[in-house]
Amino acid sequence: MKLDIKNTYSIIKTIEWRPFMRAKLLGIVLTTPIAISSFASTETLSFTPDNINADISLGTLSGKTKERVYLAEEGGRKVSQLDWKFNNAAIIKGAINWDLMPQISIGAAGWTTLGSRGGNMVDQDWMDSSNPGTWTDESRHPDTQLNYANEFDLNIKGWLLNEPNYRLGLMAGYQESRYSFTARGGSYIYSSEEGFRDDIGSFPNGERAIGYKQRFKMPYIGLTGSYRYEDFELGGTFKYSGWVEASDNDEHYDPGKRITYRSKVKDQNYYSVAVNAGYYVTPNAKVYVEGAWNRVTNKKGNTSLYDHNDNTSDYSKNGAGIENYNFITTAGLKYTF
């Protein structure tokens, strides 16, 4: 989307609503803890210090988040895409887990950036329907900041195998994550009504161009496990969700065309793989490194816009796309109390 917004086109997404399938799949998630608890029907709930472990780590966050615009009246073709890229943002990460009984554990985890981090944003438009594969307008914003990013995760695990040197279990949980960006200054190449890529210029340095926020909410299911040999331990977790609810907010700050775009997407897919390796420096303390890859796949959703200058609004379907992927690396300490 151009910063001067030459055209205000109608946008959005129609999500096919399948109540039966959605209820069935969500039911699997909600009943997983009940099924897991059957393994522990004869166990007594005990709260002792030996049942609690916590970890804290420092690391980096890198990735890319994307927003897309589709034109429903032209068959839903993509007419705009903004790519927000970020690298090596410093984060702090923590978790606490409580083994309620040998077969059941509950946990909470989360991470947050320690400050803003420089990034990059590229905004491209494909406005010529007769040549949809060639972009007509582009702006680049190397002065882009990841203002903040964070995530929290609440989960329950049911251990199918739980021995001193190895564990394997099913898990279910709820997770939310947020990202915020601001793009300033930059340069552009636009196409006028009479020409092609014939309008070239730049925006004032430091001037806000676009602000963007994403939020992801999801229940999920997964598989987790670990294996220990002497003082070395390897672990891994896989998580999946088909019920991601994503939303975003795009603020165009051009004084001449001050517009807010808001989009919502439902039932997106989420995949996450995490692997860690650690060494026990004492019987209760382990140092470890971990890598985690996460992805929310693109899907169309509903969009609304509000023009602050003339106080008008619009709403349309099949016009928005939201996507995110990131990679987290951390090193930290885990301690069992």
Regions found by a protein language model. Name each.
Residues 64-89, 112-152, 177-216, 241-274, ...:
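Extracellular/periplasm-exposed beta-strand and loop segments of Gram-negative cell-envelope proteins
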Residues 155-182:
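Internal, conserved structured core segments that host functional sites
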Residues 94-98, 152-158, 172-174, 221-227, ...:
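Residues on the lipid-exposed face of transmembrane beta-strands in outer-membrane beta-barrel proteins
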Residues 54-62, 108-114, 170-178, 225, ...:
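Transmembrane beta-barrel strands of outer-membrane/channel proteins
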Residues 9-11, 69:
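Short, positively charged and aromatic/hydrophobic N-terminal segments
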Residues 12, 20-39:
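Gram-negative bacterial Sec-dependent N-terminal signal peptides
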Residues 102-108, 163-168, 231-234, 283-287:
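Repeated loop/turn-to-beta-strand initiation elements of outer-membrane beta-barrel proteins
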Residues 39-57:
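Outer-membrane beta-barrel biogenesis signature
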